[in-house]
């Protein structure tokens, strides 16, 4: 073991012992269980909290002399220790506002922001830790087969109650690109998130990182071996580990930070004293508040195109504070500290390494990528039928019809009313006969107000003990849409079986195809319960993060209520995830096909089971624009099936807004139009013919691109790729892409530049270096059964970019979509449903580089069966273009996909007019070449599942 003295910032008394670690571990594979854990199993199979920290270039500090008294409140900071750069000050009063006397009694420094020479800074703490503030000391460091262990000791308590004075540190060098360390209480078992994480038994052979420890104050320093950049340095502020307050700070190597969802903000988070609160909450999206999901993972971009990520697996209420130094502080109200650091080195790899831990996204059924339509206010089957008929008559594709609460009897789950929905089952059968699917809302809260025997879900749930209980052991009763309600405990194995039974029984009446699970933060219309909440430390913790409403019980249930695995205090942020797991499981066992679940509440690992929509957004240009970074954020978090309510949910949309939102929504991975009961209807056919034509053009483009989109989801499912991705994921070495969040990519090949402001007929977007072809050059409508739209207005066919911002024409009927040179994408004739579009002929769009090369692939299966990869029931074909020749490679071919007909190949970037075109050696005479666009269109008659070769000269 190599021990050395660190380079400290001051020449003062104390040791900064650094131990350099260069060991590593074999990659394990994560499996997130269905939470069917017995209490005795939990200790061995849970991994606890994953914590994230961003690295920083500064060296770890060395403590100055400090005269330690018996109690923390008697400490006094040495005046010279308070000379800390304002942006590097770490808050010593996170729990409450305090006076100078109270601050100094904590042993901290007091410097009002107004007294700083550079002027006041909003958010800058007045009371902050001196570098000498006592922390833990590292002792008994020893090697293990997979890393290191050590003991951490603290000699004086902090100002939070129930400090844990002795801690255990375990460091695991799990893979070459993944470091894992945990800080626990060795004498008392604490709650750990029930996520089964990779188990690694040996050290990685060639890690990309080195690990060092500061002995006193204790800290972990993680460096990137290549260049020595510090990625994580926890010595910048003292470690806290009390029963209900855990705090860990780290420096960051840059101010370019993304992640930490869910929030309404730009893609890159501000480090100007920004607090992000993670405590799932039913609240309409707005800036600066905790929203529906909690994802304690961040990705940091570094100079030179490198990136790393950090994940803190902790489901307790927490704040994450970003400050300008730059630095980050985690403050959690419970659990343990369990930190994963992902070394990348490029951003794309960071996301994949994170998903190696939390799980790769599920593969959605093909129909789930079509258009979904819903509205709160479809109050009868007659209205729903009319909506579907109107969509068909006006030639708008519709794959999935939804219902909100309207279908229910007294707004109770697993019922339908006999007034407007007496023939509900018949309506769903009719949708199926038309090649469509059906989904409806299901809230978790179960009505408890009826007499015994009147409502089977509650009666059966009560008998089987599936509900969350209060301090007396009785079901906690809150209030949601049906009135008095109980809340299922989805961490209880019995609840999973009960939920499956309820889903199966209702499906036997109404054969729905997917589930929309809403209100699952869980939402509660009263605070806590009808009886209130007990006055205890879980309801009134010593530290309350910045939650909307100021209390953990606000708009949800009591924190001290009891669930199978732990208290709701610990499990709250997992409620939506556990319901998604239960719903996915129930659909698999009920329908026997691929599940399709869309959930409002999410947590880390959610994408493995379900998709997400962004909640009750407003019909406003602001929320239209914010939807882009939110879609990108969730793709980075491993939830690629995500979308916002097209045209907005709350408030009345306008025609222009709805057209522009539909154009952008055509490139949401999950495409749904949905709005509120009190807002004007906004189905596409409600607007003028001009608006309808513009929207229909966007629909046509999406449906033509579905084979490419489906192939992207396959990549997400098997490799951890993103579907919609920020530009920096493909171009990390171009700093101009880092903050772009008004554009998005579909995979590596398509760049979408939407109009996000009113009254605009042009749009400005960033084009990374290279050639970009306008997708309007590729004819798609002739392949399908939809009517042709009006001819496209003049457009710039090819963009030759040096890496620059460009202004493009964008009339109301146009969304700019560009195909990146070097890629081949599959297309298919668009139709009114995916049932029909999957039968249409296919095409290839080939975008050549200046050297005349391109590549791509197509994944295809039956679109809904389970286990297609395991059974080999799929087709995977790759395409490549080089030297004026296009060939395919049959990676794996079955009947599903092998018989797809290829009818058109459009080649972009053909600089010289060809005189001869061959398809499998046979001359093609009816090709067309455009000298203006440099495009070559070749009609062919080929099968995707057979080898082919296309030549031109």
Swiss-Prot record:
The active site is at 518 (nucleophile), 521. It comes from the Eukaryota. Residues 80-131 form the P-type domain. Disulfide bonds join 82-109, 92-108, 103-127, 533-558, 647-658. It is an enzyme of class 3 (hydrolase). Substrate binds at residues 404, 600, 616, 674. Belongs to the glycosyl hydrolase 31 family. This is Lysosomal alpha-glucosidase. The gene is Gaa.
């Amino acid at each position: 073991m190599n021990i050395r003295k660190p380079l400290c910032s001051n020449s003062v008394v104390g040791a900064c012992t650094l131990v350099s670690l260069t060991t590593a571990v074999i990659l394990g594979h994560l499996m997130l269980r269905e939470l069917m854990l017995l209490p005795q199993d939990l200790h061995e199979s849970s991994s606890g909290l994953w914590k994230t920290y961003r690295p920083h270039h500064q060296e770890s500090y060395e403590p100055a002399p400090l005269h330690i008294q018996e109690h923390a409140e008697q400490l006094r900071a040495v005046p010279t220790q308070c000379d800390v750069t304002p942006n590097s000050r770490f808050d010593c009063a996170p729990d409450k506002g305090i006076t100078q006397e109270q601050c100094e009694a904590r042993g901290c420094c007091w410097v009002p922001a107004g007294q700083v020479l550079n002027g006041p800074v909003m958010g800058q703490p007045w009371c902050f830790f001196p570098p000498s503030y006592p922390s833990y000391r590292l002792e008994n460091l020893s090697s293990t087969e997979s890393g290191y262990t050590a003991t951490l000791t603290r000699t004086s308590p902090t100002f939070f109650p129930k400090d844990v004075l002795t801690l255990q540190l375990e460091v695991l060098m799990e893979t070459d690109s993944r470091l894992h360390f945990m800080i626990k209480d060795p004498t008392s078992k604490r709650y750990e998130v029930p996520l089964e994480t990779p188990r690694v038994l040996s050290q990685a052979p060639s890690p990309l990182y080195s690990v060092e420890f500061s002995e006193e104050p204790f800290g972990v320093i993680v460096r990137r071996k290549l260049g020595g950049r510090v990625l994580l340095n926890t010595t910048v502020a003292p470690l806290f580990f009390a029963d209900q307050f855990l705090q860990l700070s780290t420096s960051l190597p840059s101010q370019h930070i993304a992640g930490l969802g869910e929030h309404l903000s730009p893609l890159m988070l501000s480090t100007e004293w920004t607090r992000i609160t993670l405590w799932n909450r039913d609240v309409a999206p707005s800036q600066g508040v905790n929203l529906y999901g909690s994802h304690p993972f961040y990705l940091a971009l570094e100079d030179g195109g490198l990136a790393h990520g950090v994940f803190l697996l902790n489901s307790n209420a927490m704040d994450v504070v970003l400050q300008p130094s730059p630095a980050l502080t985690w403050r959690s109200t419970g659990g343990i500290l369990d930190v994963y650091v992902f070394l990348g080195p490029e951003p794309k790899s960071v996301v994949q390494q994170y998903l190696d831990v939390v799980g790769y996204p599920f593969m959605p059924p093909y129909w789930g990528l079509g258009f979904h339509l819903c509205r709160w206010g479809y109050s009868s089957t007659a209205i729903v039928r009319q909506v579907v008929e109107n969509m068909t008559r006006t030639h708008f594709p519709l794959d999935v019809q939804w219902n909100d609460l309207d279908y229910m009897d007294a707004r109770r789950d697993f019922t339908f009313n006999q007034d407007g929905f007496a023939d509900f089952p018949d309506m769903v059968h009719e949708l199926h006969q038309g090649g469509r699917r059906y989904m409806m809302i299901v809230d978790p809260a179960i009505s408890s107000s009826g007499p015994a025997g009147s409502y089977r879900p509650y009666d059966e749930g009560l008998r089987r003990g599936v509900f969350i209980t209060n301090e007396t052991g009785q079901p906690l009763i809150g209030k949601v849409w049906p009135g008095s309600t109980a809340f299922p405990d989805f961490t209880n194995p019995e609840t999973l079986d009960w939920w499956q039974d309820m889903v199966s029984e209702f499906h036997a009446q109404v054969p729905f195809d997917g589930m929309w699970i809403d209100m699952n933060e869980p939402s509660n219309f009263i605070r806590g319960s009808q009886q209130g909440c007990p006055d205890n430390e879980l309801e009134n913790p010593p530290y309350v993060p910045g939650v909307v409403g100021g209390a953990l019980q606000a708009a949800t249930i009591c924190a001290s209520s009891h669930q199978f695995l732990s208290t709701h205090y610990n499990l709250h942020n997992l409620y939506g995830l556990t319901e998604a797991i239960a719903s996915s499981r129930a659909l698999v066992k009920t329908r026997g096909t691929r599940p399709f679940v869309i959930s409002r509440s999410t947590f880390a690992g959610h994408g493995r089971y379900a998709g997400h929509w962004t909640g009750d957004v407003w019909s406003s240009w602001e929320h239209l624009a914010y939807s882009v970074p939110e879609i990108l954020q969730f793709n980075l978090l491993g939830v690629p099936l995500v979308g916002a309510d097209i045209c907005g949910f709350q408030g009345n949309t306008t025609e222009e807004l709805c057209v522009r939102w539909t154009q952008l929504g055509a490139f949401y991975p999950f495409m749904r139009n949905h709005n509120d009961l009190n807002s004007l209807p906004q189905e596409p056919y409600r607007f003028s013919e001009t608006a309808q034509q513009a929207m229909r053009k966007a629909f046509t483009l999406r449906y033509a691109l579905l084979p490419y989109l489906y192939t992207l989801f396959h990549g997400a499912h098997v490799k951890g790729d993103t579907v919609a991705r920020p530009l920096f994921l493909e171009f990390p070495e171009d700093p101009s892409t880092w903050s772009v969040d008004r554009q998005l990519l579909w995979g590596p090949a398509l760049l979408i530049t939407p109009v996000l402001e009113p009254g605009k007929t042009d749009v400005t977007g960033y084009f990374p270096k290279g050639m970009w072809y306008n997708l309007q050059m590729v004819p798609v409508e002739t392949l399908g059964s939809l009517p042709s739209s009006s001819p496209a207005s003049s457009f710039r066919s090819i963009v030759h970019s040096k890496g620059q911002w460009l202004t493009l024409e964008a009339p109301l009927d146009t969304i700019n979509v560009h195909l990146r040179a070097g890629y081949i994408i599959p297309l298919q004739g668009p139709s009114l449903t995916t049932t029909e579009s999957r039968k249409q002929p296919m095409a290839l769009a080939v975008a050549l580089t200046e050297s005349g090369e391109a590549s791509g692939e197509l994944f295809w299966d039956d679109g809904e069966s389970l286990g297609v990869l395991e059974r080999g029931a799929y087709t995977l074909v790759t395409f490549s273009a080089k030297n004026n020749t296009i060939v395919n490679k049959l990676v794996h071919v079955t009947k599903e996909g092998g018989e797809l007909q290829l009818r058109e190949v459009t080649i972009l970037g053909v600089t010289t007019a060809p005189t001869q075109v061959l398809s499998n050696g046979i001359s093609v005479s009816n090709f067309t070449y455009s000298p203006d666009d440099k495009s070559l269109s070749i009609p062919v008659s080929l099968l995707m599942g057979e080898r082919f070769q296309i030549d031109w000269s």
